Amino acid sequence: MAKATGRYNLVPPKKDMEKGVIFSDLCNFLITQTLQGWKVYWAGIEFDVSQKGMALLTRLKTNDFAPAWAMTRNLFPHLFQNPNSVIQSPIWALRVILAAGLQDQLLDHSLVEPLTGALGLISDWLLTTTSTHFNLRTRSVKDQLSLRMLSLIRSNILQFINKLDALHVVNYNGLLSSIEIGTSTHTIIITRTNMGFLVEVQEPDKSAMNSKRPGPVKFSLLHESAFKPFTRVPQSGMQSLIMEFNSLLAI
């Protein structure tokens, strides 16, 4: 008797990659207040964003700090001693990091349209606004973005987070501690510190670094706990202790 089989069926896509990743996930930045800070949902990823370290950032900026923190303040004079620098929220820092992750994919030059155009627009939205929803009006772009493309974006963002986690805390050994991404309108610098990631957005010419006439810069801190669920190798208590001793940074 003839028997129905699925012998030549196409292999189904990996569910773990494409689970819940739809286009609207990229265009919605959902924020929920919690006791410790916020929960943020974007691109099928949930982040727990803490306010840890923000009080210290403010004290360094307002010159209300302990003498032991002087090195931190002097290491980043364009942030803490610049009248044109402005402290932002940790939510802003997360948006900038995600925008940088999208820009990192664009710099790879291996993506094709319409993915490149969509990523550029979404990156600009995250970087330059505080709105929770982005309306991509080009219907054809939405129609051409497959689940595979969307899951690729999510996967690459998680890879970028691991790239940040692999950075060394600022120290005397000259090890790589920052990632810098330049666009035609901004320069993004993300630096690893004891607490997490010091995020800054400057003008393209990095005029904030000009000691005589420092230009504008926005900055904030994203505590490392926001990325811990997504990093490959969790740090042991001893590793964290060694990291702290390797750096005299207050943050």
Curated annotation (Swiss-Prot):
GO molecular function: structural molecule activity
GO biological process, one term: viral process
InterPro entries: Filo_VP24
Keywords from the named record: Host cell membrane, Host membrane, Host-virus interaction, Inhibition of host innate immune response by virus, Interferon antiviral system evasion, Membrane, Viral immunoevasion, Virion
Record carries keyword Membrane: yes
Signal peptide: none
Domain of life the protein comes from: Viruses
Compartment(s) of residence: Virion membrane; Host cell membrane; Host endomembrane system
Topological type in the membrane: Peripheral membrane protein
Pfam families to which the protein is assigned, alphabetical: Filo_VP24
Family: Belongs to the filoviridae membrane-associated protein VP24 family.
Function: Prevents the establishment of cellular antiviral state by blocking the interferon-alpha/beta (IFN-alpha/beta) and IFN-gamma signaling pathways. Blocks the IFN-induced nuclear accumulation of host phosphorylated STAT1, by interacting with the STAT1-binding region of host importin alpha-1/KPNA1 protein, thereby inhibiting the latter. Without the activity of this protein, activated STAT1 would not enter the nucleus and be unable to activate IFN-induced genes. Plays a role in assembly of viral nucleocapsid and virion budding.
Protein name listed in UniProt: Membrane-associated protein VP24
Phylogenetic lineage: Viruses, Riboviria, Orthornavirae, Negarnaviricota, Haploviricotina
